[in-house]
């Protein structure tokens, strides 16, 4: 395993303030490295790179599902394990990207090796979550939905089922990606959530909420660096 510190994707200050930021990634990673990387705040991205950041995870022993998600799940058919990127998945993915207004689209094939948690409503696929087993833990990489049934809060239903499947598989933690910006505030309401400070896993939700709110006050990376898109 090799760590790389990329200062072409960072920024710094030294005239009136001291600041140095750069991207930290792990390469040449072996399967035996995955547990260490996850437990030390790294997340694997669609390129197969492991990036250090403000990771989040759920302690499955402390997780409690909500009554609302449980009730709404009874109106759905939920399957787990199919890893075929078929036309239905592509349709949901394209609808998801359009709904979110993303400037970029992560290649759907990046998730071809993942298990899928699928949610059907009235026989139609409405959402997919891409997940993987990593030793004694599970990782949830991406949730997508066509948002045609917003009344069913499929994101909440999926999150509940992810945790229940993780519990059934004997997982200690479910890793759920980074925790940046106000779009991730919902994570702070999950029972058992922990976040990576850079040195330890913390349960201080007040601090995490403050950090997320601060993230959303920053200019985007293109405005900050001018070359971060490369």
Cite the ranges covered by each PLM segment.
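Conserved active-site tyrosine of GNAT-family acetyltransferases
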Residues: 37, 93, 187
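Active-site/acyl-donor-binding loops of N-acyltransferases
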Residues: 47-62, 176-230
């Amino acid at each position: 395993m090799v760590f790389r510190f990329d200062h072409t994707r960072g920024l710094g200050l030294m005239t009136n303030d001291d600041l140095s930021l750069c991207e930290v990634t792990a390469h040449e990673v072996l399967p035996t490295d995955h547990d260490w990387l996850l437990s030390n705040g790294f997340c694997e991205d669609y390129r197969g790179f492991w990036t250090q950041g403000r990771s989040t995870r759920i302690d499955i022993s402390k997780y409690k599902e909500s009554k609302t998600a449980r009730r709404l799940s009874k109106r759905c058919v939920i399957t787990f394990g199919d890893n075929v990127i078929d036309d239905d998945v592509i349709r949901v993915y394209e609808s998801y990207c359009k709904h979110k207004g993303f400037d970029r689209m992560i290649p759907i094939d990046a998730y071809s090796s993942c298990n899928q948690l699928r949610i059907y409503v009235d026989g139609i696929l409405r959402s997919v979550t891409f997940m993987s087993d990593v030793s004694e833990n599970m990782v949830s990489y991406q949730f997508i939905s066509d948002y045609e049934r917003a009344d069913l809060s499929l994101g909440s239903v999926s999150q509940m089922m992810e945790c229940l499947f993780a519990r059934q598989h004997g997982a200690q933690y479910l890793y759920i990606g980074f925790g940046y910006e106000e779009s991730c505030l919902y994570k702070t309401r999950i029972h058992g959530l922990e976040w990576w400070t850079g040195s330890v896993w913390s349960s201080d939700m007040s601090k995490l909420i403050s950090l997320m709110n601060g993230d959303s006050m920053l200019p985007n990376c293109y405005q900050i660096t001018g070359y971060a898109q490369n």
